[in-house]
């Protein structure tokens, strides 16, 4: 019996090959397989947001005006979350709530779930796009891995947190002032600024900004002069073999400033990747904890002493009183459907009163 060994070749391309050729063709804007997820989802998410902020009221869900049509501006317009009574309904246009009525769907807050879900999948599609392009040009996938940080924050804040609460109502609405309101809510109801995961997130984001500024300034300061113009930006070839700036000079400078400095570019740039991405991951993890109503730091001994001694206060006890004030004022305004009424005697007061 004869066994023939050889590479199997198809006589003609099947549908997958044809699609693969078209999707991954070299063009001005790369499409790719990831584009099948990215472009439709990004289009619908942005389109839903522009539609909602332009035309759709939040009167039926929050008792608020939230569109340009009602007199809002860019900072106050928003696509608002559904009412608390709708819990975690996906609010599909053809679902039992709207029953195919587009106007009713908008009134119920259907655009929020539409924007949130398409936005989440659009971000995932963008990360897959970075994976796909990195593989095509034989790069490492660290860009895509880094982008998982913003995705983790978006998913934890807009999806996981409200899933842990009573409904989508408690997620942020998609608007500038709406996000500010949500931040105040997080502080008042969760004491978010004293949460160690928030602290790690702040350290990561601000630390990354510091590293970025230091790195950019250092590279600019140590550029090799390679042109007769005052501006050296165009004096270098993207395919050049030699260095554009002097790592040795930069190392010597920062060694004199701090006593320590990065000795190679790999560790330096990995650190610049590690700091912000880890900060974003940690803050996302903290929001998942808040979804389960986990507490931040509680310094109970200080609270007890402040309650017993009118002359004893710390910045912590003052912040706790501020949080009580946020809850007392915000709950009644933010959740009108609960008909919350707080008597004067339960409203927070400073220890000196």
Curated annotation (Swiss-Prot):
GO terms for molecular function: chlorophyll binding; electron transporter, transferring electrons within the cyclic electron transport pathway of photosynthesis activity; iron ion binding; oxygen evolving activity. Its main location: plastid. It holds the Pfam family Photo_RC. The modification N-acetylthreonine is found at residue 2. It is a multi-pass membrane protein. Pheophytin a binds at residues 130, 143. One of its GO terms (cellular component) is chloroplast thylakoid membrane. It is found in: Plastid, Chloroplast thylakoid membrane. It catalyses: 2 a plastoquinone + 4 hnu + 2 H2O = 2 a plastoquinol + O2. A plastoquinone binds at residues 215, 262. The modification Phosphothreonine is found at residue 2. PSII is composed of 1 copy each of membrane proteins PsbA, PsbB, PsbC, PsbD, PsbE, PsbF, PsbH, PsbI, PsbJ, PsbK, PsbL, PsbM, PsbT, PsbX, PsbY, PsbZ, Psb30/Ycf12, at least 3 peripheral proteins of the oxygen-evolving complex and a large number of cofactors. It forms dimeric complexes. Belongs to the reaction center PufL/M/PsbA/D family. 2 of the reaction center chlorophylls (ChlD1 and ChlD2) are entirely coordinated by water. This is Photosystem II D2 protein. The gene is psbD.
């Amino acid at each position: 019996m004869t066994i023939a060994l050889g590479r199997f070749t198809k006589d003609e391309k099947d549908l997958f090959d044809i699609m693969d050729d078209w999707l991954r063709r070299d063009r001005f804007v790369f499409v790719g397989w990831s584009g099948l997820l990215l472009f439709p989802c990004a289009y619908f998410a942005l389109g839903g947001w522009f539609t909602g902020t332009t035309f759709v009221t939040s009167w039926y869900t929050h008792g608020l005006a939230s569109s340009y049509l009602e007199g809002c501006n860019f900072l106050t317009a928003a696509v608002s979350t559904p009412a608390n009574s709708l819990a975690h309904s996906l609010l599909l246009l053809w679902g039992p709530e709207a029953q195919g009525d587009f106007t009713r769907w908008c009134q119920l807050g259907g655009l929020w779930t539409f924007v949130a879900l398409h936005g989440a999948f659009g971000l995932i599609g963008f990360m897959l796009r970075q994976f796909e392009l990195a593989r095509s040009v034989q790069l490492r996938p660290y860009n895509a891995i880094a982008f998982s940080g913003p995705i983790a924050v978006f998913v934890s804040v807009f999806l996981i947190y409200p899933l842990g609460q009573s409904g989508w109502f408690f997620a942020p609405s998609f608007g500038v002032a709406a996000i500010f309101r949500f931040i105040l809510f997080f502080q008042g109801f969760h004491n978010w600024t004293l949460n160690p995961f928030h602290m790690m997130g702040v350290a990561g984001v601000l630390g990354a900004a510091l590293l970025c500024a230091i790195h950019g300034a250092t590279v600019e300061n140590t550029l090799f002069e390679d042109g007769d113009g005052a501006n050296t930006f165009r004096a270098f070839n993207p395919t050049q073999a030699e260095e554009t700036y002097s790592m040795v000079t930069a190392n010597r400078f920062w060694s004199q400033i701090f006593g320590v400095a990065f000795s190679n570019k790999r560790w330096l740039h990995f650190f610049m990747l590690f700091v912000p991405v880890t900060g974003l991951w940690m803050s996302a993890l903290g929001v998942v904890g808040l979804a389960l109503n986990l507490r931040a730091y509680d310094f109970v001994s200080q609270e007890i002493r402040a309650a017993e001694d009118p002359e004893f206060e710390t910045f912590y006890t003052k912040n706790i009183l501020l949080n009580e004030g946020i809850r007392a004022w915000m709950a009644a305004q933010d959740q009108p459907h609960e008909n919350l009424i707080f008597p004067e005697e339960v409203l927070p007061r400073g220890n000196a009163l």
